[in-house]
Amino acid sequence: MQLSGVFLQLGEERLPLLLRGVSIGKLKTYQLYERFKTRTHLAKVNTENLRKASPRFWSRLNDQDEEFATDLSQAILISHMDMVAAVLNFIGVPNEEGFFAKDPDPKQHLTEGWQTRAWERFKDEYPQPLLLFYINHLDWELGGAQQAWLPAAA
């Protein structure tokens, strides 16, 4: 599965919820703002423009624009590094404030049922669409997931 497939399998209704959490300040801090602005074809990146662009973004994901999917996922996740670090710490993946540490094989830490354990631990602490996206992104990135993981009641 490609990264665009993670978005697609989670459903169009979750995309606006993910976009709502994008932090312009964090994009600028991590020097991703200009790249993201260029990739999204927005004259200015703000919450209103992101909300309005959601249908266009969905179309690009449907077209399997992987560079766009990568930049979009970076913008979403960099805006929530506290959650990323918390999940990685919980499942035992070595990291430095949410960024992978120099572990030769971080996927060894993704033991059977890690998705369910992470979901149950954090579903009431972070926005559920965001947590669900990160669990699936991590599974795609490290575990090579071919199918999106969904909790029983999501």
Where are these regions (language model features)?
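Short terminal alpha-helical segments
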Residues: 1-33
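Aromatic-enriched hydrophobic runs in primary sequence
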Residues: 11, 147-148
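Acidic, low-complexity, intrinsically disordered interaction modules
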Residues: 21-146
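Short intrinsically disordered terminal tails
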Residues: 1, 150-154
